[in-house]
Amino acid sequence: MKKSNSTFKDVFFPVIFLLTSCISSCSDSDRKDKTTNSSTSVNIQFPFPTEHYDEALDGRLILLISKQTETEPRFQLRDDSKTCQGFGMDINDWKPNEPQRFDMEAFGYPIHSFKDLPSGEFFVQVLFHKYETFNRADGHVVKLPMDRGEGQQWNRAPGNLYSTPQKVTIRNGQFPSLTIKLDQKIPPITEPEDTKYVKHLKIKSKLLSDFWGRDMYLGAHVLLPEGWETHPNVKYPLAIMHGHFPSDFGGFRTTPPDPELKSDYSERFNVEGYNRIVQQEANDFYKTWTGPDFPRVIAVKIQHPTPYYDDSYAVNSAAQGPYGDAITYELIPYIEQQFRGIGEGWSRFVYGGSTGGWESLAVQVKYPKEYGMCFAACPDPIDFRAYCLVNIYEDENAYYEEGIFRKTLVAGHRDYLGNVNATLRDMNYRELVLGTKGRSGQQWDIWEATYSPIDEEGYPKRIWDRLTGKIDKEVAAYWKENYDLAYILKRDWAKHGKDWTNKIHLYCGDMDNYYLNNAVYLAEEILSETTAPYYNGEVDYGDRAEHCWNGDHDNGNHISRLRYHRMFIKKYVEKVHNVAPKHADLKSWRY
């Protein structure tokens, strides 16, 4: 997610108190996902935004409080200690001319209750995340935020409303009486245009439209090989890069870095001028892609955002529907037909990091004959005995390591030296502010939306109680049989091993920030014990390497993360003879 460069001035607004209807922060089924103290109301009210909408609205109202003025508060809610304060509450059927207000029942992060807020001067901003109603084929009616071209980002979603930040004084946990107008509306996304090399497409998916009860689409950004137009009889392998929602085919730039580009600083990598490095790497890739020695393949980045996240995790699931089938049997064949792909399983290979790493291994496991090879870097947990630092099968609680006389919070994020800057509990609490019923659009919620069965309302079942951390063992058993990739490999090796051999390649830093290396260790043990046939792939680790190390021992993460295409396309070409049938054309596309 990109960071905003916007700033705001110290603006005071008239203070008005209106007697308004009260709203609850959670539905009855999610009542446990909030803290409750109804002794005092927070007198912040919101007139209905009639200048933007004239119909009743459903959604999530998010109140943000900050001291920092370099960016708007809506861009400051994060997992570490630099976060702003947030509170969230659901709004259902908000009718015109009916103002709403917050009360003390709204759940907060990192401070959970209004009454515990420190005294002082702060900036306050409110954002309304708009939901839509879906009448799904399974009979459930659910309210969710439809993606609107931004890749499921609550603070950037077109159509969402937000207020101009204003200064307030908080004393002893009490707000002054305020009226906050949702006077700003996020504009639509501008779609990228086709170029000589990059083409953009979108198709209506019948499978997904049938499931969701409305038209649903899949998209792709397609990078054509050098010489595609002048070699009309050549068919090409398909290089599919999985990962978070791509707004364009990033990392490919036909011109040198912008000489007027203002240098920035990467907090993650501690590098000055990182934006210039990114542009230079993109231009270098263009030169490599069009150069005489690079393999000629079609490279693709897929758009498959769902009402739960910026992508579907590329598999079928109870809450999100048949995204795995839609991508594999609708979108990919369409791309191959449009741009002369070879269209056989051996000629399709997948790669990606983090989310894209899990997806790459998942589609190889779930569709063993439809894909010829996978390269999975820093994958999300591929063995749920190490769901980050939680063993969902044996641990009783996800948030604490518990003994007779004490309990210790479980870490959620570390640096390469092991310094912890976020706990798993707080990461989950932040998501709870952004949305109940799995609707935050964030990491822990999408794992549940992907792996879990649905509850009686049609939303994903929790793997653990979001307030207490108590693990639901029935849900864990469902996860194991359907989405624990390492377990499935072991369980089904006798059946599918011949279709997995030579195809699985895993890479992870041994100091991954999210402890993802732990699951890779367990998966490696399973793979190393395979026989008849042996898996004959690769597992590699980077010493003290953080998220998202991808097998590059020569460059730091800040460089290697920009070279996925160059690295894995070459690896595929080096190994393709191991998976291609005798009749396969391995020459015509090597001009």
Where are these regions (language model features)?
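Contiguous beta-strand segments within globular domains
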Residues: S38-F48, D54-I62, Y217-H221, I240
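Non-catalytic cap/lid and distal C-terminal segments of serine-dependent acyl enzymes
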Residues: K67-F107, H112-Y591
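Bacterial Sec-dependent N-terminal signal peptides
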Residues: M1-S41
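A short, compositionally biased domain-edge/stem linker segment
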Residues: S21, C26-D33, F48-T50, L182-T190, ...
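Short, solvent-exposed linear motifs at loop/edge-of-secondary-structure regions
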Residues: Y53-T69, Y329-E330
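A diffuse structural propensity rather than consistent per-protein peaks
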Residues: T7-K9, F13, I62, P322, ...
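Small/flexible residues
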Residues: S4-N5, V11, D33-K34, I62, ...
